Amino acid sequence: MSVILTETNGSDERRKVAIVGAGLVGSLAALYFARMGNQVDLYEYRDDVRKSELVQGRSINLALSQRGRKALSQLGLGLEEQVLSTAIPMKGRMLHNIQGKTSVVIYDPCFKQCLYSVGRKQLNELLLNACDKFPNIKCHFDHKLTKANVKEGQLEFKRSHSVEGVKAKADLIVGCDGAFSALRQNLIKLPGFNYTQEYIETGYLELCIPAKKNEFQMPPNYLHIWPRDNFMMIALPNQDKSFTVTLSMPFDIFASIKNPEELIQFFTQYYPDALPLIGKEQLIKDFFKTKPQHLLSIKCRPYHYENKALLLGDAAHAMVPYYGQGMNAGMEDVTLLNSLLQQLPLEEALAQYTEQRWQDAFAICDLAMYNYVEMRDLTKRWSFRCRKMLDTWLFRLFPTIWVPLYNSVSFTSMPYSKCIANRKWQDQLLWRTFLGFIVVGLGVTGSAIYWQRFR
């Protein structure tokens, strides 16, 4: 495949760019920077994911939506088509009640848009393989960042098999190294850098519903949810006909399950339809082999330091995984940055990136928190389903005006903060309309009573 290099309008200068983190966002950013003609060094503290069976500590599948698809498409390398060729479309949520009965909530009854379940490892491999085709990208695996002097553009890395560190220098350092970003830890020390983090009291464990006779055990084209008030379970389909199951519960509930008998009793009570699909022996093995993982939300700003350093993806805005937007938001970071670099000099582009992105990043972090409450509890309520039906009806009538919150987040590139603003005016309009009906109803009732008494 031939690689076409593009030029930035902001500057003709070619820079040496160091990207820390070769995950989904880091490898995508490397491709965009390389297409501009920059010399890119991509550093990853893990070994090459293409030589590993699993990506340790990370969910093995993800939900790809419009923002991520746009980032893949704009590269012009055919990556979106390659991803979708093996991805599994999910057209809605399938809700499992405590009796094992199911109901379906379609994401987009109007335009039939859907999410796509993609394998993290497969997508990462695809991006890294694309990086290999660029002569101006060099990948450095087993390089853990230990020091960063962003003012001087100096980096130091540690390798697992060597006592001596590796030193590097770059014109621009880009941190794509996740929620526990080593580069961000260096930026925190600089004046004017604001940072907050919040752990939630919920942990998660990953389980598996295996394939049976090489077929899915549940309908594959849905995100499956078992809402149970203050805890829940979800399942996404995999390409091998299995489902990755995520059990999310408060840590005290995890701690209360001390032995296999209590675990089977718990699943019999709360997830009776899932238990035979997972299998008792496999459930016991998977549940007790690891401790539940913590979840946190991170907000920080600014995302840049002068024209020297920048944070993207989870390094800039880690979020809980319940809106399926972590990867998509990170990829959208890259497309926004790319558009600014096409128009502005580097330092101005980085400043504009922070200015244009921070409110949207904060917004999606908040939405992810909200969606956890929705998925575990609100989806069971009749009020939620009525609102969903009303949103769908209004969306059919006014598709350019009345875009439901979930649709605007998942199926458009509307800024996240505007998605929230839209939802607020929709809520206000519905509430005022509801109050108007009450006032009119009371007026009609009062008039009828008056007419009956005094005619």
Curated annotation (Swiss-Prot):
GO terms for molecular function: FAD binding; kynurenine 3-monooxygenase activity. Its main location: mitochondrion. Keywords: FAD, Flavoprotein, Membrane, Mitochondrion, Monooxygenase, NADP, Oxidoreductase, Pyridine nucleotide biosynthesis, Transmembrane, Transmembrane helix. It is found in: Mitochondrion; Membrane. Pathway: Cofactor biosynthesis; NAD(+) biosynthesis; quinolinate from L-kynurenine: step 1/3. It is an enzyme of class 1 (oxidoreductase). One of its GO terms (cellular component) is mitochondrial outer membrane. It catalyses: L-kynurenine + NADPH + O2 + H(+) = 3-hydroxy-L-kynurenine + NADP(+) + H2O. The chain crosses the membrane at residues 393-416, 429-453. InterPro entries: FAD-bd, FAD/NAD-bd_sf, Kynurenine_monooxygenase. Its cofactor is FAD. GO terms for biological process: 'de novo' NAD biosynthetic process from L-tryptophan; anthranilate metabolic process; kynurenine metabolic process; L-tryptophan catabolic process; quinolinate biosynthetic process. Its EC number is 1.14.13.9. It is a multi-pass membrane protein. HAMAP family: Kynurenine_monooxygenase. Belongs to the aromatic-ring hydroxylase family. KMO subfamily. Catalyzes the hydroxylation of L-kynurenine (L-Kyn) to form 3-hydroxy-L-kynurenine (L-3OHKyn). Required for synthesis of quinolinic acid. This is Kynurenine 3-monooxygenase. It comes from Drosophila willistoni. The lineage of its organism: Eukaryota, Metazoa, Ecdysozoa, Arthropoda, Hexapoda. The gene is cn.
